[in-house]
């Protein structure tokens, strides 16, 4: 019987400690680092400089399946225009290098390669440039050259497997 008061005291101490732990506010977790966006680098001043060109190099080109529209890249931006000629509309622009546009089989979307997330990955956007969505998230073996499956359900892309970069 002499141990019973000691046992009760221990139980009260444990219960008090447990209650105190639940009553204390939780320590705030470290805030997540902001997601890297090439188009909005932190602490950088960005300014646009107009460039007028009459020809291009290192360009990528794709024709919509219905043959009415071309998508092409120039200086890291993606444009569309009627295949019959006319004015080009820039649908992907900014500091990110956005290249290799490929129309989906139904022509409603365009897959492309972009480094806007920090490395070359495959993205998809609507034909008019809206709703850009990153579909791969590689940070080591980077991806490029997207190709749609005939039914438009899948995208295949080239993945780098070289031990280093080359020209």
Question: Where are the language model's segments positioned?
Answer:
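Bacterial N-terminal signal peptides
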Residues: 11-23
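Blade/loop signatures of beta-propeller domains
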Residues: 29-50, 68-69
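Blade-terminus and WD-like Trp-Asp/Gly-His loop motifs, strongest in beta-propeller folds
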Residues: 62-68, 101-109, 146-154
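A structural motif specific to WD40 beta-propellers
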Residues: 89, 132-133
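A flexible loop/linker signature enriched in serine peptidases of the S9 family
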Residues: 30, 34, 54-55, 73-79, ...
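Sec/Tat signal peptide C-region and signal peptidase I cleavage site
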Residues: 24-28
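Beta-strand-rich domains and repeat architectures in extracellular enzymes and scaffolds
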Residues: 46-81
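Bacterial N-terminal signal peptides that target proteins for export
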Residues: 2-13
């Amino acid at each position: 019987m002499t141990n019973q008061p000691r046992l009760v005291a221990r139980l009260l101490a444990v219960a008090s400690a447990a209650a105190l732990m639940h009553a204390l506010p939780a320590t705030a977790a470290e805030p997540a680092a902001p997601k890297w966006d090439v188009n909005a680098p932190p602490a950088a001043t960005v300014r646009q400089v107009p460039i007028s060109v009459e020809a291009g190099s290192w360009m990528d080109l794709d024709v919509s399946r219905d043959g009415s529209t071309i998508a092409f890249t120039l200086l890291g931006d993606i444009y569309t225009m009627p295949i019959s000629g006319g004015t080009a509309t820039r649908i992907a622009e900014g500091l990110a290098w956005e290249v290799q546009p490929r129309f989906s089989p139904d022509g409603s979307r365009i897959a492309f390669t972009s480094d806007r997330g920090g490395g070359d990955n495959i993205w998809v956007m609507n034909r008019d440039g809206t709703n850009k969505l990153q579909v791969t998230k590689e940070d080591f073996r980077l991806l490029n050259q997207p190709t749609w499956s005939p039914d438009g359900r899948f995208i295949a892309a080239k993945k780098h497997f070289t031990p280093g970069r080359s020209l």
